[in-house]
């Protein structure tokens, strides 16, 4: 995750120096703060405690996500994340089809302030088949200046249809 964030920050830095991002321009500061309008996160969540049929999205957990990434400097395990979601040891998170719809919707808008619109997908191996099918086309042929960064701990568990469309 830290490398993905550094890469996105470098791509969108308006004042690169010595092969690195400046860390000072508005884009760098917003990306470092996980609050840039052209940076989107997708990560596994669970509808624990929600009413049946009520979907949950990564956006519902952004304040907690920012807190965990900040506290741990981006280095934390899936279980640490699930513990923060109060899922215990048996429940896990997933990336849903509704989340995939949200990704497509967010990326359909024009870039707000950065050179690239970026989506960091943390643990894409938790994406269900329906979600994967929904994003296949945009993953294979993303819109201009759109970047997906998949951060996987178990690439062997990625759906073959997703894996075949990545570099």
List each language-model region with its residue ranges:
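Conserved adenine-binding aromatic site and its adjacent loop/helix in ATP-hydrolyzing domains
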Residues: 105, 137, 164
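Conserved Walker B catalytic segment
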Residues: 117-118, 122-147, 154
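Clamp-loader machinery-focused feature within the broader ASCE/P-loop NTPase space
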Residues: 1-130
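A short helix-turn-beta junction within AAA+ P-loop NTPase domains corresponding to the substrate/partner-engaging
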Residues: 161-167
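Conserved H-loop
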Residues: 156-158
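Short glycine-/acidic-enriched loop or helix-start segments at secondary-structure transitions
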Residues: 51, 160-161
């Amino acid at each position: 995750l830290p490398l993905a964030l550094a890469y996105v920050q470098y791509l969108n830095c308006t004042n690169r120096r010595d092969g690195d991002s400046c860390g000072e321009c508005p884009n760098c500061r917003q990306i470092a703060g996980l609050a840039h309008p052209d940076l989107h996160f997708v990560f596994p969540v669970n509808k624990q405690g929600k009413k049946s049929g009520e979907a949950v999205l990564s956006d519902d957990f952004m304040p907690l996500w920012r807190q965990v990434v900040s506290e741990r400097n981006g280095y934390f395990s899936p279980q640490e994340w699930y513990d923060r979601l109060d899922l215990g040891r048996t429940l896990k998170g997933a990336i849903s089809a509704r989340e995939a719809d949200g990704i497509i919707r967010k990326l359909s808008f024009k870039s707000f302030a950065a050179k690239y619109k970026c989506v960091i997908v943390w643990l894409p191996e938790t994406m269900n088949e329906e979600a994967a099918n929904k994003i296949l086309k945009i993953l294979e042929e993303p819109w201009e200046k759109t970047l997906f960064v998949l951060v996987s701990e178990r690439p062997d568990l990625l759906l073959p249809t997703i894996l075949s469309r990545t570099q």
